[in-house]
Amino acid sequence: MWELIKANQRKSLILFITLGIVLIVLGFILGSAYSPDGGGFVGVFFALIIWGILSLISYFTGSKILLAVSSAKEVTKDVHPQLFNIVEEMKIASGYQFMPKVYIINSAAPNAFATGVRQNNTAVAVTAGLLARLNRDELQGVVAHEMSHIVNRDVLFMTFAGIMLGSIVLISQVFLRSLWFGGGGRYRSKSSKDSGQAQLIFMVIAIAFAILAPIMAQLLYFAISRKREYLADATAVRLTRYPEGLASALEKISDSTEELKTANKVTAPMYIANPLKSQGRKLSDLTSTHPPISERIRILRNIAQGANFINYQSAFEKIKGKKENLIPPSALTDSSSIGLKESVDLPLTAISKKKIQREAGDIMMKVNHYSFINCSCGLKIKIPPDFKKEEIFCPRCGRRHSIVK
């Protein structure tokens, strides 16, 4: 697995440098459009300043912002022991040094993501809807996928690559809007004095590059994002030795009709499945943040003989119908056999699903500081945190209960 991580880091560096070159060239061209004599270097300086500020904000507070925007709340082990145990199992299986924090998102839409640019401050967040639908094997598959993103340093890379992309888009938009809102007159009057022709050429090039640079950067970013989803699936199979768990989880996520209202275009690439489903169907493969979920499921269900990377690579090529180097050759040299395990977890029935849905609702109430009283009649009384009285009557049997503050 370490070969895959190293290869991932090399490719990440190449992409990061490529996006950096696009950012620098964009800054130089736009700066030259303002002033052909030395303006290009000023443009590069300001482009790097913008990127640096956004990077610092992301490094120190990015995870907090993402979790807050997603309405995710941190939970302790007593709130959901099974989820904590699974995260801990996958942390041990992956050989990761630090235990990620665990968050639950208050949404009925099943989904999950991982975040954290610093190795000692990572987090795995799952929705209440995911907990309501999945059995243990399926939940383990999802957590293993997210743990793979952390171990492979995808979270770090996608965060800073996303900032680079955001800087390119921001600078381009500011430049184009400045032209739209009356900037053109200033350029014309200036160009009529001395280097009119040179500035006009730079202006045409700048407009074209300001339009094309964000598109090129996004296509590159999305292509790498899609590939990393495949690699996280492959690593999850290696960690769990049970591809059907993740395949079944992805199937249930895909079948869900609930909308994840807290997701947006910025946070969408972080999730295990595209949360913007209604928009995602209209997009081509080039502009999608995730590979087709049906294809991911077919690959997982075609894995045979073992849970090694080479087994995933074989299934990947079979479904794609062509040879394609998804996993670096250095990671395929491991000849040790990792056998697939058989599931001992039963599928959810209609009754058990209802029970889990109620439990997921109770979890979110517990996270939001509700307290619970189990009445002898079998009713669980849920008391909101702002309830002021010292006693409460059971709405079913009328029994009086004291409230311990």
What residue spans do the PLM features occupy?
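Zn2+-dependent metallopeptidase catalytic core
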Residues: 77-98
